[in-house]
Amino acid sequence: MILLVNLFVLLSVVCILLNLAGFILGCQGAQFVSSVPRCDLVDLGEGKICFCCEEFQPAKCTDKENALKLFPVQPCSAVHLLLKKVLFALCALNALTTTVCLVAAALRYLQIFASRRPCIDESQMSAEDVEEHGRIPDPDDFVPPVPPPSYFATFYSCTPRMNRRMVGSDVIPLPHIYGARIKGVEVFCPLDPPPPYEAVVSQTDQEQESSFQMPEGPETAASPAEPVCTQITQGGALTNTTGEENTSGSTPILTLVQPPRSRRALPLLRTRSKSDPVLHHSEERATPVLSCEAATQTERRLDLATVTLRRGARPRASRCRPRSLIDYRSYIDTKLLVARFLEQSSCSMTPDIHELVENIKSVLKSDEGHMEEAITSASFLEQIMAPSQPSTSQAQELSWRRQPGLLHLRSCGDLSTFSLTARPRAERRPQQRAEAERPHSLIGVIRETVL
């Protein structure tokens, strides 16, 4: 580009010089023609010519060099006048051409100089940057760069309505399970995969486990500060802390021990382990153990057995894994979504998307064991509760409108979440009525989830 510019400037200068020379020569010729006053027709041996000279007598101008000879195409006076006009026109045109070339060259030079000034500034700035890079960096002056935008948002950054249109109305979108929000943008999955299930269980077993045993006998006392889920497996009687003994010999007694009314109200929520360790602990001892939801429905006489409950001193931190069995379907949908991307050739996929698909596959493989474990627990619970269904149909159903918020499940089908809400009106009712209107289990929801 610079070579073309230099060539244009050079040609412009040449044109200016040539036009200037033509202008000078044209002016000199016009001046010479104007200096000749008259032209006479002279007969020479070769023919007649118009001889123009400064002298009035043509015989005196034959030997002079400043004489003008013209061929008589027209009368001599007309030829002389026409020549003078042509020379003046040529002089004017040369002057105009010289002016145009000079202006064009000047504008081009100005444009070149204006474009070279930023280059000079950039060269000076680059030299200063080199000098700064040569210095020793100060940690206090370091400013961290702005992190790039997440590529997960471009992979799955549509609204929930659009998600349903893309995947289907009966599919749970993936961000509802492995979703996160970074600066108000819903991304595809968390940056780090969830921790392994075995590592979390081993850590919680060392820090947050505490067990207690219930002695055999007609009466059992429990701590008034915590709700205790009691159980009778084959035969025996069990009472609550109020001191009232059960006189029924054919019906079991499964109650939630309530604290004295003078004490403070119970905590609103008691959370057990998400994987229901009571069931796994009982499978090793070959002793059938029911969860709190199933124990409230049992109408058979069972023997008293030792039940180990694991409770945490503080609530567990939320982990990025599903909390209920109904989320297992979304895992299948996620596998289908990953399979769609894997159908494409690796050449068409960018490295970022390929790495994202591999991370999702690793997360799904790490959580398959956890979901199978939850399904096994639900199946075991269904087998235990199957014989007691005829007797449970005779129990009085609790109205959810009259006593809202008695049982809360964090998600539909959660096996290990039980909450007790303090109800002032229920405390003022007689205890017999409370026992008659005890809550029923959500085993139907669990069965539906398993199916």
From Swiss-Prot:
The lineage of its organism: Eukaryota, Metazoa, Chordata, Craniata, Vertebrata. Disulfide bonds: none annotated. It comes from the Eukaryota. Keywords: Cell membrane, Endosome, Isopeptide bond, Membrane, Phosphoprotein, Signal, Transmembrane, Transmembrane helix, Ubl conjugation. Residues 204-224 are annotated as: Disordered. Residues 107-451 are cytoplasmic. One of its GO terms (molecular function) is ubiquitin ligase activator activity. InterPro entries: ENTREP1-3. Belongs to the ENTREP family. This is Endosomal transmembrane epsin interactor 1. A motif (PPxY) lies at residues 148-151, 194-197. The modification Phosphoserine is found at S275. The gene is Entrep1. The chain crosses the membrane at residues 86-106. It comes from Mus musculus (Mouse). Functions as an activator of the E3 ubiquitin protein ligase ITCH in the ubiquitination of the CXCL12-activated CXCR4 receptor. Thereby, triggers CXCR4 endocytosis and desensitization, negatively regulating the CXCL12/CXCR4 signaling pathway. PANTHER family: ENDOSOMAL TRANSMEMBRANE EPSIN INTERACTOR 1, PROTEIN FAM189A. There is a cross-link at K274, K365 (Glycyl lysine isopeptide (Lys-Gly) (interchain with G-Cter in ubiquitin)). GO terms for biological process: CXCL12-activated CXCR4 signaling pathway; negative adaptation of signaling pathway; receptor internalization.
